[in-house]
């Protein structure tokens, strides 16, 4: 557990990882050790179609989870990977289930449904609009940049979905498979919570967007009327994104930047922010609806 720049306690959390129980290269015990050593407080082990209950491994807290993937490898026919996190019991699902059935069953079991790596899956805003109850989506997925498609970043999906009125909490996850230093301990969320909080409280904090997604930097976004402010750890770039294809004050570059401000334009529907540090590591804010 760490405290942010405002003294708020936060947990370092990864919500997407695989083990030898499906297609990962480490056992659950080895995977937990890797993340424990990297300072993580909570992880969800999300093997494909293999539900793992909540608990603890080697002192690392485990949220229940599984990844339900459907559609094979051809995005033209629809590919959906949905994480079921924090379920109180095993969802009653078969691999014939469609994406909406998966979401509904995860909710029936008191979990949250996260749309995984939409850029990697080539998911569209139209596909997302057909799904009811998606609780969050990944804006970054580490393994998707490692030899499969090089589509780790889902910002374009997030923005086009927001243009259609679809707003999601944005998480960053590893989706660890190889554990080779490229896809492990590279992206996470910093969740406003305490390690003594219940699973239900952690899930509620995620749904209420009480976190930021990051590869290292800290980021906070605030709105005061038509003024949007980002406060962050020292970075070299602060960028604002919205439905406006062009607007002033959206790109800020420099050394040791810790703050940037932009003003909302009358036609804007949403604004979010990203920061990039000197090492190229990014952090992503929540989406502010206007």
Where are these regions (language model features)?
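Fold-independent oxyanion-binding glycine-rich loops
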Residues: 65-67, 87, 116-119, 174, ...
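A metal-dependent hydrolase metal-coordination microenvironment
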Residues: 1-112, 116, 122-126, 130-133, ...
């Amino acid at each position: 557990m760490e405290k942010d720049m405002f003294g708020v306690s936060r947990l370092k959390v990864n919500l997407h990882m695989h083990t030898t129980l499906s297609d990962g290269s480490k056992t659950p015990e080895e995977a937990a050790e890797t993340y424990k050593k990297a300072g993580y407080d909570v992880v969800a082990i999300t093997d494909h179609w293999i539900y793992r209950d909540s608990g603890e491994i080697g002192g690392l807290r485990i949220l229940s989870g599984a990844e339900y993937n459907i559609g094979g490898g051809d995005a033209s026919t629809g590919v959906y990977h949905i994480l079921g996190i924090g379920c109180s019991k095993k969802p009653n699902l078969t691999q014939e289930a469609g994406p909406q059935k998966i979401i509904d069953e995860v909710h029936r079991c008191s979990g949250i449904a996260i749309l995984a790596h939409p850029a990697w899956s080539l998911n569209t805003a139209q596909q997302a609009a057909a799904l009811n109850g998606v609780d969050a989506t990944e804006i970054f997925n580490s393994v998707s940049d490692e030899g499969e498609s090089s589509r780790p970043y889902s910002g374009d999906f997030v923005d086009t979905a927001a243009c259609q009125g679809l707003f999601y909490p944005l998480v960053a996850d590893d989706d660890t498979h190889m554990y080779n230093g490229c896809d492990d301990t590279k992206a996470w969320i910093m969740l406003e919570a305490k390690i003594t909080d219940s699973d239900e409280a952690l899930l509620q904090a995620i749904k209420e967007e009480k976190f930021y997604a990051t590869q290292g930097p800290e980021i906070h976004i605030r709105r005061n009327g038509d003024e949007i402010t980002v406060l962050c750890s020292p970075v070299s770039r602060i960028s604002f994104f919205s439905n406006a294809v062009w607007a002033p004050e959206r790109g800020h570059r420099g050394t040791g930047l810790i703050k940037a401000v932009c003003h909302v334009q009358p036609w804007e529907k949403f604004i979010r922010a990203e920061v990039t540090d000197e090492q190229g590591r990014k952090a992503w804010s929540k989406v502010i609806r206007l």
